[in-house]
């Protein structure tokens, strides 16, 4: 049975606290996996997966990124990384968790897994902190042409200036995710594309 311990550590932004969890096996650990979750997720959402891995000897750690889960201390902070260098701070927080965990398990192989938004954070992490993990798993990633990204960024920036950068924008959300569900019509929910499991979709 997995042992789970939740804790907080200071964010690299110098203001926030980052919520995290560590799952440990009953027996001697064989490796460490750090998870970088996706947008609108949180680390504890991966608890069943983490518990499965502990049965095979893994230590698993996952934090809630800035603006997510228990790292978002106010409703206004939900999905908001911050006013300055937010992406950088999220990646630096991932590195801080890695350093904290590696200090506890210095001799174990260390792996980093990023899903969806977490995959892009992981790619940035590998550029900023090369050689600090033994391997990486990049799931649900992709890329877009600058010709598509630039207008989307301009629309998001304009929406932020008009309504506030912590406000929810249906237009920006539609631009980011709207096309995904078209492949799964007729749709039961707005996020049918997320998983083949209806339970996973409903819990999300």
What are these regions (language model features)?
Residues 1-27:
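N-terminal cap/lid segment of alpha/beta-hydrolase-fold proteins
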Residues 30, 37-41, 116:
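Active-site glycine-rich loops that stabilize anionic/oxyanionic intermediates
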Residues 35-48, 60:
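Serine-hydrolase catalytic-loop signature spanning alpha/beta hydrolases and amidase-signature enzymes
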Residues 48-76:
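Conserved alpha/beta-hydrolase
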Residues 82-102:
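Alpha/beta-hydrolase active-site loop
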Residues 105-116:
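Alpha/beta-hydrolase fold nucleophile elbow
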Residues 114-124:
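Glycine-rich nucleophile elbow surrounding the catalytic serine of serine-hydrolase chemistry
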Residues 122-203:
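Alpha/beta-hydrolase-fold enzymes
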């Amino acid at each position: 049975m997995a042992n789970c311990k939740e804790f907080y550590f200071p964010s690299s932004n110098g203001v926030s606290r980052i919520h995290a969890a560590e799952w440990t096996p009953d027996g001697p650990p064989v490796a460490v996996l750090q998870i970088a979750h996706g947008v609108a997720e949180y680390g504890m959402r991966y608890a069943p997966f983490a518990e499965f891995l502990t049965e095979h000897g893994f230590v698993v750690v996952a934090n809630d990124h800035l603006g997510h889960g228990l790292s978002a201390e106010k409703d206004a902070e939900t999905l908001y990384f911050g006013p300055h260098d937010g992406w950088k701070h999220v990646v630096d927080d991932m590195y801080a968790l890695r350093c904290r965990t590696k200090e506890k398990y210095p001799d174990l192989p260390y792996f980093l897994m990023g899903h969806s938004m977490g995959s892009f954070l992981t790619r940035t992490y590998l550029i900023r902190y090369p050689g600090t993990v033994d391997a990486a798993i990049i799931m649900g990633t992709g890329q877009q042409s600058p010709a598509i990204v630039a207008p989307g960024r301009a629309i998001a920036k304009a929406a932020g200036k008009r309504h506030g950068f912590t406000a929810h924008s249906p237009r920006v959300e539609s631009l980011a995710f709207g096309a995904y569900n078209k492949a799964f019509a007729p749709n039961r929910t707005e996020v049918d594309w997320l998983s083949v499991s209806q339970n996973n979709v409903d819990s999300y």
